[in-house]
Amino acid sequence: MVSEATRQAARARREEILEEIEKNHLKELYPGSGKCMLISGMYPGVWLEHAYDGVAYADAVGQRAEVARHQIDLFLDGQREDGQFPFRVTAAGREYSHLQECVPFALVCDLALRRNGNAGLREVYEKLKQWDAWQARYHTDERGRLLTFCGWDTGHDHSRRLADFGIYETAATTEARDRPQQHAVLPLIMPDMNAVYYGDKRVLSEMAGRLGLPAEQARYAREAEALREEITVTCYDAADDFYYDVDCHGNRRKIRSIGVTALFVSRFFEREEGRRVFSRYFRSPEYFGTAYPYPSIAVSDAAFEKNAPGNSWNYYAQGLTMLRSLLWMDDYGLSDDLEANMERWVTALTPRSAVPFGQELDPFTGAPSSASPYYSSSMIFYLAALRRLGI
């Protein structure tokens, strides 16, 4: 429960956040872009993994649907002729060195379009088809599994998942299609990245159905299911009831990462499987069920360590994880858990601190890390929580 004192303070913080967003985050990135939701001073511009920020903000404040559309247009307009989307758009330009999609962009586009009368559905669908084809051409293996070429493909900075990537822990080249050569473990097959790829195909199938394209609807549904089967065979460990990364030699790398939540976001998990995995891992303090959910690595894993003062996907509970939980927890029948998470984050974020509304929290104490004050995902989740909790 959120105390009455915290509830009163939170109402004042809400006004502060709205003012902060209006002043420093809702900006045109370049002439004609329309106002978009920028991330923070630490992270200029908008990353592809933050495309959902526009939709989430519009939902959290109950208006400003145009921001959701402007957010996706940053990437749709930046698509190369070969189909690749930029991983980041800033006032200085567009960058294409890695993937870092993290949430199915097709899903975000669908949500943004629905909030804007579905205008331009066919045009967006065609662009998403090109993105799917680009990934198939440059970033998959012979079995259709999406490959991880570098650490930044994942968005999980400082995670032990990337421990032996060497120069590829970040992005070693300026082109996302450049494949590591003769590397000890790369390319990897990661369940979260493949779930995102699956999610894109799943939404493409749904869009094709709405557009009256039954052959394409069936094709993308078939490809999505084939990918799900491949990733289950490759990454699923029945004894642990968990999905793990697999290296280029077929070895499973047994780190329980918060990346598993991408399998919920993308609806890779059927409802029963998702609820089972959630009950075992997310309600237990041995894994992800900490006081301030959810740590980026299960706390009982040998890899779990506070290895950086901030921006660590090896320890902290991330605002991004919480914001993305709005995309799946209700649909899996986990509404009570979602609201409990909201109460904990509101309790942690409301008191004033040196890093207001930062990127991440200590999963045990709720103290902010050093990373990124006034971080978009944390602010938007806070607004969504206040709205939902009636504060």
PLM feature segments, named:
Residues P44-A51, V55-A68, I72, D77-G166, ...:
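Aromatic-rich carbohydrate-recognition surfaces in CAZymes
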Residues V2-G45, R69-E95, G144-L188, E229-Y316, ...:
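Extended glycan-interaction surfaces of carbohydrate-active proteins
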Residues V185-G199, E216-R219, E223, I255, ...:
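Short, contiguous, pocket-lining structural segments
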Residues A221, V299-L334:
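Amphipathic, soluble alpha/beta structural segments
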Residues A5-E20, R64-D77, G117-A136, D200, ...:
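Extended, well-ordered alpha-helical scaffold segments
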Residues V55, Y198, S205, T261, ...:
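Conserved small-residue packing positions in alpha-helical repeats and bundles
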